Amino acid sequence: MRHQCIQIPFKVNLLNKYFISGNHLSQLGELSGYYCVKDIHQRMLQHPIGQRILNDKPRVTPQTFKIEELLKLDENTFGHQYGKFMKDRDFSSGERPIVKYIPDLELAYVYQRYKEIHDFIHVLLMYDVSVYDEIVVKWFEMAQLGLPSATLSAFVGSFKLNCQEKQKLMETLPQILKRAHKSEFIMNVYFEEHINTDITQLRKSLRLL
């Protein structure tokens, strides 16, 4: 029997009201995603790399991923491409809010990790941060992780697109969903160990190409 913390109509109303405020979406995700986060936690426990991530609990912060240092790496590395992505958009990994509404510390870390690797997913999938690109990434996250916040962003966000973007999304969805289902489980990727990895090789090893 599947559990739901918040009824869908209530969540849709929230998303419409705040679309898409980072803080409100983050709170919504924590409140509605508890049982999905438990499922993600179990999948991580069943994988050796996932186990190491849960044991080490690495964080993605301005201190652990120093942009200026990343930009000194070879241009073809994952680290350099992530650093360029963040610098070009004036983003900071420190802007991600801390999980507050998941009382279990282990599950709170899992959800924090999900939020902190979001920009890595953008880089790996080669999608920017426009509304259209963000929605495509949310469809990928929905297919892989099943989180209610990603699901609502994917579906409700699609209505915010213009006609041309909606048509483009319909053409893109089969491919992005296929990539989500065939690729490695993104929460079991120890990104910190791939800073110097050629980004094309990383995409291939994760079956994202």
UniProtKB/Swiss-Prot annotation:
Function description: Lyase that catalyzes the C1-decarboxylation of 4-hydroxy-3-methoxy-5-(all-trans-polyprenyl)benzoic acid into 2-methoxy-6-(all-trans-polyprenyl)phenol during ubiquinone biosynthesis.
UniProt-annotated binding residues for Zn(2+): H118, D119, H122, E134
GO cellular component terms listed in the entry, alphabetical order: extrinsic component of mitochondrial inner membrane
Primary enzyme class: lyase
Metabolic or biological pathway, per its Swiss-Prot or TrEMBL entry: Cofactor biosynthesis; ubiquinone biosynthesis
Location in or out of the cell: Mitochondrion inner membrane
Record family assignment: Belongs to the COQ4 family.
Enzyme Commission number(s) of this protein: 4.1.1.130
Entry keyword Signal: no
Organism: Paramecium tetraurelia
GO BP annotations, alphabetical order: ubiquinone biosynthetic process
Remaining remarks: This protein may be expected to contain an N-terminal transit peptide but none has been predicted.
UniProt membrane topology term: Peripheral membrane protein
UniProt keyword terms in alphabetical order: Lyase, Membrane, Metal-binding, Mitochondrion, Mitochondrion inner membrane, Ubiquinone biosynthesis, Zinc
Assembly, per entry: Component of a multi-subunit COQ enzyme complex.
Pfam families: Coq4 (PF05019)
Identification of the protein by name: Ubiquinone biosynthesis protein COQ4 homolog 2, mitochondrial
Entry cofactors: Zn(2+)
Reactions catalysed: a 4-hydroxy-3-methoxy-5-(all-trans-polyprenyl)benzoate + H(+) = a 2-methoxy-6-(all-trans-polyprenyl)phenol + CO2
Protein origin, superkingdom: Eukaryota
Main location class: mitochondrion
